[in-house]
Amino acid sequence: SERYDTILCDVWGVIHNGRHAFEEACEALTRFRGGGGKVCLITNAPVPKAQVISYFEPLGVPAEAYDECVSSGDATREELKIRQDQRIWKLGSDSGWERDRFLYEGLDLDFTDPDKADLLLCIGLRDQLNDHPSLYRDELRQGIDRNLPMVCANPDKQVRVGGKLYWCAGALAEIYEEMSGQVIYPGKPHAAIYALALSR
């Protein structure tokens, strides 16, 4: 660890599993910080960092384990800021377990129907546990037919929460690309989230 001054560390599956913290990982990050290193947590959660951090204490992730946190939600918001003049078709639920409405709160966005949109914002599946991505193929075809670029708020295809697997926006983005659609990925493992993390 002496060779590095900064760690960019994933969240899900590394420091917690959505149900409880992984103590050894948190302790290792805390020790790294104690030696003068900086830790920036990066996650593909499609919500701003404030919502991500709000989960940490209940899960047992100590504040001493990190200096900063950057989410795919943060990087997606940066992308949406430069597209506030575009009409957006939003695909995903406002009432899911990640409370996706925080993704676009405070931004002056014009949400509309698919036939009027300039851009498709994919937050995820409406039912992350019970829906299957293939069920959305006909719906995604509307975006393909209108040549809408998709902004994928979470590049992950699935996430494990405790013992359950939940589908994520990345699964729909994969189908969209298979259908020859253009997808913009602000989150991991793509460049935007790392640039944002290093800027902080």
Regions found by a protein language model. Give the residues of each.
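HAD-like aspartate-dependent phosphatase fold
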Residues: S1-R200
